[in-house]
Amino acid sequence: MLVWLAEHLVKYYSGFNVFSYLTFRAIVSLLTALFISLWMGPRMIAHLQKLSFGQVVRNDGPESHFSKRGTPTMGGIMILTAIVISVLLWAYPSNPYVWCVLVVLVGYGIIGFVDDYRKVVRKDTKGLIARWKYFWMSVIALGVAFALYLAGKDTPATQLVVPFFKDVMPQLGLFYILLAYFVIVGTGNAVNLTDGLDGLAIMPTVFVAGGFALVAWATGNMNFASYLHIPYLRHAGELVIVCTAIVGAGLGFLWFNTYPAQVFMGDVGSLALGGALGIIAVLLRQEFLLVIMGGVFVVETLSVILQVGSFKLRGQRIFRMAPIHHHYELKGWPEPRVIVRFWIISLMLVLIGLATLKVR
């Protein structure tokens, strides 16, 4: 919005031209989202406490989690608010990629909100019925994927970028829709599963979003895209603004979510952020890169799949508890140790993922 306004005012004062620079808008997008999160935090926490919107803790979970019962949840609302406001202020409003991310972000946020509401207000520990949750997540993912396929059919926008190989970028055809669907829905659920300890999900999300900000900048720059042998996508540059907004909002939320947490993001935050990372990866044609950079989310999800599969097939569990972060808790690791070590692993994976862009 401000970019559009600046374009009309630049003829009166040349200083408004600074709004056309992507790097400037990326920085102020991050700062805007950060300050909104920091401003909303105390107010959101107080309001959630007043409404008695406290975390519901499973009785079969680690004993250390019982003290978390009643901690305000649904704090993801402040993350989403900060991201949406920042993006609307600093991104070009005509960019279709920006709107794709916002549709998934807000859509998944609404699904998460309904799930949280049923858990917190109606005291239903199961929340939104699983089949309805997946149904609406699928509707949003398939709708966006189909629209993107029609808009980018037989162009670089529907190619598959394979790491470590320079010119291996096959056209996916209709498989693009299927891949996009699984990436968006899968990442949404993966971040949701990871959100089990104070700050555990938000910091890897910040790292991955920061990594994608660099990838989006390169993908939207013809020279750098050619240099790195990745598809040049002219709309991709504005995703830098979205990614930095996620970074800023995430850091602002972490201020209140760090151990011991004053507020939890809830499904309204985790589903939305996961879905956003998924659609960003799809738009940038970097689904494989998401698997590498988001390795913490992948391992958390695989631990649940393996645990359930092993118990059904063999009657035995692989881990003491899944997702895997609970396994380490039950082994006696203090919660802060689990969190920080997962953060370190996440940062390493993001750096490795970025390195693969050059190793071709």
UniProtKB/Swiss-Prot annotation:
GO terms for biological process: cell division; cell wall organization; peptidoglycan biosynthetic process; regulation of cell shape. Pathway: Cell wall biogenesis; peptidoglycan biosynthesis. One of its GO terms (molecular function) is phospho-N-acetylmuramoyl-pentapeptide-transferase activity. It catalyses: UDP-N-acetyl-alpha-D-muramoyl-L-alanyl-gamma-D-glutamyl-meso-2,6-diaminopimeloyl-D-alanyl-D-alanine + di-trans,octa-cis-undecaprenyl phosphate = di-trans,octa-cis-undecaprenyl diphospho-N-acetyl-alpha-D-muramoyl-L-alanyl-D-glutamyl-meso-2,6-diaminopimeloyl-D-alanyl-D-alanine + UMP. One of its GO terms (cellular component) is plasma membrane. Residues 47-71, 115-131, 189-198, 257-262, 309-337 are cytoplasmic. It is found in: Cell inner membrane. Its EC number is 2.7.8.13. Keywords: Cell cycle, Cell division, Cell inner membrane, Cell membrane, Cell shape, Cell wall biogenesis/degradation, Magnesium, Membrane, Metal-binding, Peptidoglycan synthesis, Transferase, Transmembrane, Transmembrane helix. It comes from the Bacteria. The keyword Transport does not apply. Belongs to the glycosyltransferase 4 family. MraY subfamily. Catalyzes the initial step of the lipid cycle reactions in the biosynthesis of the cell wall peptidoglycan: transfers peptidoglycan precursor phospho-MurNAc-pentapeptide from UDP-MurNAc-pentapeptide onto the lipid carrier undecaprenyl phosphate, yielding undecaprenyl-pyrophosphoryl-MurNAc-pentapeptide, known as lipid I. This is Phospho-N-acetylmuramoyl-pentapeptide-transferase. It comes from Escherichia coli (strain SMS-3-5 / SECEC). The gene is mraY.
